[in-house]
Amino acid sequence: MQAILLYSMSHMILLVSYTKSIIKHLLHIGQAKKKQNIKINQSHGGSGKQAITVINGIESDVVTLALAQDIDAIASSGKIAKDWQSRLPHNSAPYTSTIVFLVRKGNPKNIQDWDDLTRENIEVITPNPKTSGGARWNYLAAWGYALTKSNNDEFYAQQFVKSIYSNVKVLDTGARGSSNTFIERKIGDVLITWENEALLAINKIENHNVEIIIPSTSILAEPTVSIVDKVVDKKGTRAIAEAYLEYLYSPVGQEIAAKNFYRPRDKNVAIKYSVQFPELDLFTIDKFSGWDEAHKKHFSQGGIFDQLSKR
C-alpha cells in the first residue's frame, strides 16, 4: 500500500495514497486549528513496513494501514492506545474494498470465480502474504470462499488454496509489484487484487488490455486508521490529527474515497456510486476469529501458508 508523509516543524502524518485529494482540506484544518503551514513529502511502502517504521521511532501523527493487525502492533509498542479501534465508527475503518480478479481483455481463459484459479492451465499472479499485508486479504478471500463452498471443511479449504498458490507464476513481495508483473510485463492469466487497484488500472492506465471479474464471494477488506497517541501528545497535535481522521468520515471525505475507488461507508455516497461498486456476497475477518487468530494460524512461521507453499 502506498503512503504519503506530511510534515512541518511539528507535524508528520502517514496517509495512504488516495488521500492526496484530501491534502488541501488537511492544510485548511491545520491552518485553522494551529495557524501553521504544513509541508508535504511522500514516502512509499507496504503497510507492515510502515508500521515498523512507526514502532522504530518515526514520529507519525496518524497511521492509515491495510491491516488492523499492523496498528495493533504499534499499539503493543505503547505508542497507540489499546482501544484505538473503538474510537471511530466502523472499527476505525472509514472506507473499504474487496478482492477481485483482473484478467486479459476478452477473458480468454473464461475465469469467472475462485474455482477457475485452481485449474491446471491457469497462471495466477498475487503477492506473497508473508511480505504483503494486502496479499493476506487475497489469501483469506480464497480460503473463506472454500469454507463457504464446503460447509466449513478446513481440509478442503487448505487443499483448495494450495491449488491456487501452486498456479502462482510470480509471487511478488507487494501488491504494486504484482500489478506491474501482470499489466506491464504481461505475465499470467489472472491477477488477484484489491478492487480499488483493479478499478484504478481500468480507469487510469492507458492501453491496459485487462478487465475486472467479480467473484461470487469475497472478503470485506477494511483498511484502518488511528492517531499515534504518544506522538500527538508529545507534539500537541492531537486536535489536528483527530480532525483529519474525522474528516475521512464526512460526506466530502467519503466522496473523495469513492472517486478513488474505495467503497464508502456513507450510505448516500454509496448509492451515488452503486454502479461502480456492484453488490456481492462479502464475509469479514470475523470468519477467521479476527486478525490475531488469522495471523497465528495462517501467516506465522510454520503456519498454514508456509506448509502449503512447500513444493
Label each residue range with its predicted role.
Residues 106-112, 131, 144-152, 231-239:
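Short helix-loop capping/hinge motifs at secondary-structure junctions, enriched
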Residues 2-132, 274, 309:
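N-terminal segment of the mature folded domain
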Residues 98-107, 222-239, 256-260:
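A bilobed periplasmic-binding-protein/Venus flytrap-type ligand-binding module shared by bacterial periplasmic
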Residues 232-311:
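Extracellular/periplasmic juxtamembrane helices and adjacent flexible linkers that interface
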Residues 56-57, 92-95, 105, 116-119, ...:
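Extracellular/periplasmic catalytic domains that process cell-envelope and extracellular macromolecules
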